[in-house]
């Protein structure tokens, strides 16, 4: 984490500790008297303990060295960036805080994207996107499949897919036919798939297999509330078996009262399945992964780091 604000660096670090996300280094630049973002990026890019770089910035007096460094580094290591000071009142506060030329956020964000950074809007999103980029191979496509055991959360996930500019995958005729035969009539068998009336581990695993095998699907998101029929512990083995057979990203959105699923979540994440607690956080993280995949697709030598 490299931040112009000591407070924000602590905010991100404390949340990372609370969520079990590893942090190698937390660096506060303040008013950047003699060290700036561009000075630190090459070091962090070559640091084997750093899987992803988080930047929080308020403004830059001379931004061109930063953008040059980002263009060189982002094909090798992901960078997630947030620019604060989006409104007139906060722009003034940013300038008085660090003495930097804050500038319009739209211009900064466009330049950051052009340089290969994944731009986010909130501190929580910094951490969520950095987590998935440290765990999952970037995806090459924007077609998302959603599975849930309740209709409402599936709709929330679908809303966020559209909000992030992603696409709900249209299953192939073969996949749709196989799902129609596998799942009972009351189940919603189109995307998003509602598994409410098919709560068996066998049906769950076969549904995951069919969806991941579909060439129209680039990533799979599974929503799960804690209940006796299907817990993160019960789906762990089926999901991990199918993960071994597919290079496509799989994300889990899971929630429960505190203390019930933490151990299972740790085990899933240790196996490369990122877990988030709310639909919006899950899809925003996936969108960040996909945007970094698009950065790699556009850079020379980046294609081999992608899922397909």
Describe each PLM feature range:
Residues 2-308:
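Catalytic-core regions of core metabolic enzymes
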């Amino acid at each position: 984490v490299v931040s112009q604000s000591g407070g924000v660096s602590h905010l991100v670090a404390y949340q990372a500790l609370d969520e079990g996300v590893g942090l190698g280094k937390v660096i506060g630049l303040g008013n950047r008297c003699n060290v700036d973002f561009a000075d630190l990026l090459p070091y962090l890019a070559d640091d084997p303990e750093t899987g992803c770089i988080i930047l929080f910035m308020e403004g830059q007096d001379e931004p061109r060295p930063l953008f040059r460094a980002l263009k060189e580094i982002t094909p090798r290591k992901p960078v997630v960036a947030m620019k604060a000071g989006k409104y007139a009142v906060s722009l003034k506060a940013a300038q008085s805080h660090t003495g930097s030329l804050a500038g319009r956020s739209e211009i900064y964000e466009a330049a950051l994207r052009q340089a290969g950074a994944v731009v986010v809007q909130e501190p929580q999103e910094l951490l969520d996107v950095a987590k998935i980029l440290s765990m999952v191979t970037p995806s090459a496509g924007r077609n998302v499949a959603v599975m849930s055991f309740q209709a409402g959360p599936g709709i929330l996930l679908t809303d966020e897919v559209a909000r992030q500019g992603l696409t709900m995958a249209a299953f192939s005729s073969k996949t749709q036919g196989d799902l129609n035969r596998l799942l009972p009539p009351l189940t919603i068998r189109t995307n998003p798939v509602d598994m409410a009336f098919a709560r068996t581990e066998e049906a769950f695993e076969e549904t995951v297999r069919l969806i991941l095998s579909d060439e129209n699907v680039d990533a799979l998101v599974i929503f799960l509330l804690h209940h006796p029929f299907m817990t993160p512990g019960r789906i762990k083995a089926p999901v991990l078996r199918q993960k071994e057979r597919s290079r496509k990203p799989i994300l889990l959105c899971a929630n429960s009262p505190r203390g019930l699923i933490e151990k299972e979540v740790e085990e899933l994440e240790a196996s490369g399945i990122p877990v988030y607690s709310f639909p919006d956080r899950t899809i925003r993280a996936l969108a960040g992964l996909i945007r970094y995949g698009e950065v790699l697709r556009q850079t020379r030598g980046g294609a081999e780091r992608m899922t397909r």
